[in-house]
Amino acid sequence: MGNWVVNEGISIFVILVWLGMNVFLFVWYYRVYDIPDKFFYTRKLLGSALALARAPAACLNFNCMLILLPVCRNLLSFLRGSSACCSTRIRRQLDRNLTFHKMVAWMIALHTAIHTIAHLFNVEWCVNARVNNSDPYSIALSDIGDKPNETYLNFVRQRIKNPEGGLYVAVTRLAGITGVVITLCLILIITSSTKTIRRSYFEVFWYTHHLFVIFFIGLAIHGAQRIVRGQTAESLLKHQPRNCYQNISQWGKIENCPIPEFSGNPPMTWKWIVGPMFLYLCERLVRFWRSQQKVVITKVVTHPFKTIELQMKKKGFKMEVGQYIFVKCPVVSKLEWHPFTLTSAPEEDFFSIHIRIVGDWTEGLFKACGCDKQEFQDAWKLPKIAVDGPFGTASEDVFSYEVVMLVGAGIGVTPFASILKSVWYKYCNKAPNLRLKKIYFYWLCRDTHAFEWFADLLQLLETQMQEKNNTDFLSYNICLTGWDESQASHFAMHHDEEKDVITGLKQKTLYGRPNWDNEFKTIGSQHPNTRIGVFLCGPEALADTLNKQCISNSDSGPRGVHFIFNKENF
């Protein structure tokens, strides 16, 4: 139990608090509309659907307040960089911002469904009551407001039968129009956010996500017409519903039961979302300001396996290891921004990214940089690009541990390129405050060509550690997870050579996936009473495996070995 708490305790606590707030708001506002006399006659007209519509509306306000905060990248980076308010454990929660963003989005979808279905029943009953297709009591309540100097309870004033009457409400009432619009926006945003769409049609995901602007505008004005109505406080003093409701025919004729007066609830949603909307507006202004700063591409390198490297310079640009940036190339698309991990080290006088060509945008950038041509390209022909960032990630904490495991899958090795480069520079400069004592590096890749661009860095590190008589500092395992029979025969023939046939390194390439259980047990036995940071940039399936290994191989007590799992999310 203790090892589970070390890795997941704070995350579970945050989720439980969030779920608890949703339950509290739902129950509280359900009772607000289901018990007080203010809504006594509204309940007589609408039944339990009134409370079932308003309770999820309160939860929607709460979650729509939260949904923007996890995507305020500059705010999160500021919090992450403030050691005074963020310990390592708190920063790990900030690294799960996108996971929380998705959870909040699904909660919004759930409450939207409940809210919409309940209001569909409300509209049907209100329309039926106006066309005398309901019980006499509801009809009598709906007729209040037809005479001069009366305030109405039933917001439907036209006498049009269903389904035409319901459609009329949807296209003439502000709540109906905005409800349809924001629900459609939500459906498009959620359906375009699936993994398949994001990976294969990123542009669709990118553009539909910007429907959030329409969503929040519609949400802010959704309740402006105040169609949910209740009895006024002044009217309740003169007309007590529980004493008068059985004598509806005598209302206005006897002193203790005058005709009740009704008013609509003031809109509240804007009060919930105005703060986050302001923060997000500031976020976008900062991004716009950064995007206008000049970026110079100093070098473009074409690597094997459809990968290019961009080396750039920007005035005032400062970075930490493992951070990422957003890149826009107006020649390819004037609006799209794409995230890329920085592969350079803070000690270098430029910053770089490695881009794998996998979609329309990256293909366009590949051609814009002249990488599809054989001849050398002049620097002035390179496209202009905009850069936003850098932004913090889990990998920033790598120097907070004495022992770390770095696991990269495929192009997921990029953040660790930055880390390993920085380690190399620190050793060259004999950095006195380097806490890190041991690195276990794992790289899993399907294709042999993918290793080529990274091998030079590993060779430099290998040589440096030998010169410093510290070959034990870095232990790396390069795992080839895909090969055919001819390759296997070739590897076997050269197995006894001094250097690896694929990477040129002294450390031999391994074939197949690591036995993670053995790896964790071996590392744990070599470093007792140590907090070991486990950093992954790779697929969710591998993340689940490593997270379970961290939990199962950590000691339950405060002493002993503890594996702390961290995953890149951007």
UniProtKB/Swiss-Prot annotation:
Residue spans, topological domain Extracellular: 37-46, 131-163, 223-267
Ranges of residues in domain Ferric oxidoreductase: 54-286
Residue positions the entry lists as glycosylated: N132, N149, N247
Record keyword Oxidoreductase present: yes
EC number per UniProt: 1.6.3.-
Binding site for NADPH: I411, R446, T481, R513
Necessary cofactors: FAD
Protein name: NADPH oxidase 2
Membrane topology term: Multi-pass membrane protein
Segments on the Cytoplasmic face: 2-9, 73-95, 195-203, 286-570
Assembly information from the UniProt record: Component of the phagocyte NADPH oxidase core complex/cytochrome b558 complex, composed of CYBB (heavy chain (beta)) and CYBA (light chain (alpha)). Component of the phagocyte NADPH oxidase complex composed of an obligatory core heterodimer formed by the membrane proteins CYBA and CYBB and the cytosolic regulatory subunits NCF1/p47-phox, NCF2/p67-phox, NCF4/p40-phox and the small GTPase RAC1 or RAC2. Interacts with NCF1 (phosphorylated form). Interacts with NCF2; the interaction is enhanced in the presence of GBP7. Interacts with RAC2. Interacts with RAC1.
InterPro entries the UniProt entry points to: Cyt_b245_heavy_chain, FAD-bd_8, FAD-bd_FR_type, Fe3_Rdtase_TM_dom, Fe_red_NAD-bd_6, FNR_nucleotide-bd, RBOH/FRE, Riboflavin_synthase-like_b-brl
Catalysis: reaction(s): NADPH + 2 O2 = 2 superoxide + NADP(+) + H(+)
Subcellular location: Cell membrane
Pfam families attached to this UniProt entry: FAD_binding_8, Ferric_reduct, NAD_binding_6
Gene Ontology biological-process annotations: defense response; inflammatory response; innate immune response; monoatomic ion transmembrane transport; respiratory burst; superoxide anion generation; superoxide metabolic process
Annotated source species: Bos taurus (Bovine)
Residue sites binding heme b 2 per the record: H115, H222, R226, I227, M268
Transmembrane segments: 10-36, 47-72, 96-130, 164-194, 204-222, 268-285
Sites of the Glycyl lysine isopeptide (Lys-Gly) (interchain with G-Cter in ubiquitin) crosslink: K161, K294, K299, K306, K328, K334, K381, K506, K567
Residue ranges the record marks as coiled coil: none
SUPFAM superfamilies: Ferredoxin reductase-like, C-terminal NADP-linked domain, Riboflavin synthase domain-like
Residues binding heme b 1: H101, W206, H209, Y280, R287
Lineage, opening ranks: Eukaryota, Metazoa, Chordata, Craniata, Vertebrata
Function according to Swiss-Prot or TrEMBL: Catalytic subunit of the phagocyte NADPH oxidase complex that mediates the transfer of electrons from cytosolic NADPH to O2 to produce the superoxide anion (O2(-)). In the activated complex, electrons are first transferred from NADPH to flavin adenine dinucleotide (FAD) and subsequently transferred via two heme molecules to molecular oxygen, producing superoxide through an outer-sphere reaction.
GO-annotated molecular function: electron transfer activity; FAD binding; heme binding; metal ion binding; NADPH binding; protein heterodimerization activity; superoxide-generating NAD(P)H oxidase activity; superoxide-generating NADPH oxidase activity
Enzyme class: oxidoreductase
